[in-house]
């Protein structure tokens, strides 16, 4: 091996310990492996891991950030590039590939020479093999879900069969639904289920264009795995499910009979996840019909715009809604439930109010909240512990942690019983009764008796999980021998402290870990006794927390202890299996217990957030979707106001039917338009999740969907420009939104020419007003769009019925210095000036550049450099731009342009060749140009 050592985080990379013969044998094996561009393959060499070929290059570039980490294994003629990976770096790589990325899979091989075998494999949707590594030191905050899809056409209508698998919660689900060409329902399902991986048949019907579906999967950050169509089979499905589903098979047959297209995907999932190959799955799964209409629909654009999920570049956790609301969730099961709730906001007013009632109970009773929080902190992740019990390699640790968690039930029950507020009936039915049922049926008593009888709980202080020595005489003998050795070790501890003139435990500690029994002292104490240490003791390790050392007596005693403990472990092995098996029979009860506690955990976190902010959150009034308005007084963006050094300026939002249901918001860049429309979406989502909201007062009409077109970025990797991405997202809104949705659109049309952008923006506004009729916040730099609020003639009566209102973000220009000051207040009325040049000044552009910009603006747009203040807006708005076209020209021209766009969109391009499309487009353009002869606004496009 050649090349300089690379030292990530201050330590050298592990050295390759292969001789020439071993290297040649491995190279021979490695080159025979089948090619898989997605697979990252790592090889376990006991003390370290290695990666080879393209995988080594990937790891060097992605994780070490230098190619100097690469080594050549073997001769230059047939050798392969390689990289060594420490155990700590292996955990980092595994977490990144399986929990953060969606373009790789992970494979782990064990063996030596040319004899290696695949022992673990994982994908973002199936992490089971690596769970112990991934979550050894971290909570599991999300439940990875695999989904399988099967698109099919019936009578010219596209349908999609969907099945999902949640291996963490042992749940299967099915759904099928009609779909549009943009696969908007699939996107909503992928978001709501939190999918990490999607199975798709590689050879679908040729009449179905899968490109939009693949784009949806990519936009949702989901790994696409193509399988043969033959894998999507439903033969013997009921029989197979009968082995893994709890209860009778008859309800399963009845459920399957309701589906035509979802059965194939379900069969593909069973095969792909190999559920039938693991007998620990038998009788442990549930299956359900998944209904897309149970929750608010969110697409990937809305998730990004509202910052729902944590991002890789987030500086702190408050950058995302999940990070902010996860402030006091204590364990993984609560965090996973919060993650699911944020992607599945409720639609039922009663369900929303039930959650709000419980949050209010905790908000109003600090002692109740604090008491529960202290108990919840002492509870482990019950879902994962129950999952661990089902593994064939399960040991006593999950049994003990379940026992310790369940021991908190009487305390939680007692705290809840003390609450006698206005929501006591709800608290009793939701939390107290399930806990009392657990206690009344003596489930806790039976499990506790098992653990207390079978396990030596006194040894937990030493970090050991032992079967009680009372179980057998052999264990009793070994326990006595261990006690004798322990006494010798403790006596040696005292003698050593005396020899070094140190106090026992305070200055000289006795520890037991991977190094066996060792002594530890601080670096400061080590300097005082260094001479004595040099003569009679052996220093094992020096770290920040102190110096670990031993001597011959301690080493011999430690070796004796380890040997006896090994015998004890072997002797208790059968009993351990029995205890784990019996504990596993309580799994269903544990799962119900976990569901109660995780919901309690999340609602507690909501209450903590509502009361701990500088300005407390308020309870929103919730009305049905066909009633009420959306009124947010003094609303704030929860994530922005939580940032250090931010003094957030609140704003009112009044989306009132017939008055201001559709709002056009103008004003300078950086003035707060984007923040305002996003915070409205965030407040609505938080309310429907069941949380208090950052407002002074809030009334919210339930929305079935939030659509967002905010800040489209380039997607060059997918061959999609900023403008095309903007149009694709807008197309999803036009096709998927209803009058019960909430739409937020920011700066539509800025990715193309001014005239094209304005024409599109006008036509889209008209469509949303006339057809969709949903509450809409439309932030724009096209000030001419404000004319839409004044069209009250008979021809546009349907627009005035919805209620169109103009708002602007305030700005002040000093008349003398011409300096711009952002006020960040949203106020009634239109802003008819662009502040682009002022913003450039604000950003300290060179004076010469600003002067030239003003000159060109004056030439091209007849820009007035002298401020002219209108009576209603005064100096908060600024100078006006001369209108070149009359409102009538704009209205008629935009209507004709919209007709052109609708006709063009209706062309069946999938059925036409290029020459025919060009012929039709040329004719349509000629007709439009003819109509433009008497319309100055339309003429500008030619």
UniProtKB/Swiss-Prot annotation:
GO molecular function, one term: ATP-dependent DNA damage sensor activity
Gene3D superfamilies: 1.10.1420.10, DNA repair protein MutS, domain I (3.40.1170.10), MutS, connector domain (3.30.420.110), P-loop containing nucleotide triphosphate hydrolases (3.40.50.300)
Keyword 4Fe-4S: no
SUPFAM superfamilies: DNA repair protein MutS, domain III, P-loop containing nucleoside triphosphate hydrolases
SMART domains membership: MUTSac, MUTSd
Pfam families (alphabetical): MutS_I, MutS_II, MutS_III, MutS_IV, MutS_V
Gene Ontology annotations of biological process type: mismatch repair; mitotic recombination
Major localisation: nucleus
Keywords, sorted A to Z: ATP-binding, DNA damage, DNA repair, DNA-binding, Nucleotide-binding, Nucleus
UniProt binding sites for ATP: 667-674
Domain of life from the UniProt record: Eukaryota
Location in or out of the cell: Nucleus
Gene Ontology CC terms: MutSalpha complex; nucleus
Quaternary state and interactors: Heterodimer of MSH2 and MSH6 (GTBP).
Family: Belongs to the DNA mismatch repair MutS family.
Reported function: Involved in postreplication mismatch repair. Binds specifically to DNA containing mismatched nucleotides thus providing a target for the excision repair processes characteristic of postreplication mismatch repair.
Name of the protein this chain belongs to: DNA mismatch repair protein MSH2
Source organism per UniProt: Zea mays (Maize)
Lineage: Eukaryota, Viridiplantae, Streptophyta, Embryophyta, Tracheophyta
Gene it is expressed from: MUS1
